[in-house]
């Protein structure tokens, strides 16, 4: 906990009134060896700077949440991380290999990506998830490919709808299909842009528990953007807060303070700890 904060007996972290500005040396280093490194990345649309000097890393077995208000570059950063957008400066490294020098197929073997909004094509749920095996198929599909898809469909509660067409299912169901497809890619790094945005609370909890299970079981690294601070605080290991296209702060759960939330989001909050998890409560 920073020296300008202390916890009262009510479990609420209270901030001293002086500024947080002098304490901006929040390091974005991740514990352990980073499997994915964002090294000095900058990106602009025409002359408008969206990302500047981004440095961040994520380790195997870790979930990193990218947080911040709308329009700060969270989704753009995720799209740079798998080369959908090419950074104008800096590099994205997976296992110290530069993604910009890889083919699309090689990138897909290393990085799985789920967009915030996914297009619904005319194919079945099963075939859509099966596409996740495409980077690994050398000649034809194997029994192992089919078994992996069937297992993933069962884990995500999609078995009963595997023969339905994905343009006929709900937005929340499509979201689960897309996450399921990314996981059967067996990537080293999983990138999830608002993975719970189209889901009700029950499904949000279910899919985040599944993501946590996949990360722990397969020892992959996951980076996800999220709007819901409390869900992020519950499921992620570390947090990067973005502001104005830059990383404003990087911390674990103990570094999430009322002062930091106010500086990033512009709202006054209390942060209480419940079962050793921080909970953000707007005032």
What are these regions (language model features)?
Residues 165-169, 173:
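Conserved ABC ATPase signature
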Residues 82:
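Helix-to-loop junction immediately C-terminal to a conserved catalytic motif
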Residues 190-194:
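Catalytic Walker B motif of ABC-type/P-loop ATPase nucleotide-binding domains
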Residues 143-161:
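Conserved ABC ATPase "signature" region
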Residues 2, 14-20, 258, 264-283:
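ABC ATPase nucleotide-binding domains
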Residues 67-69:
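The feature captures the beta-strand-to-loop junction immediately N-terminal to the Walker
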Residues 90-98, 107:
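Conserved ABC transporter NBD signature motif
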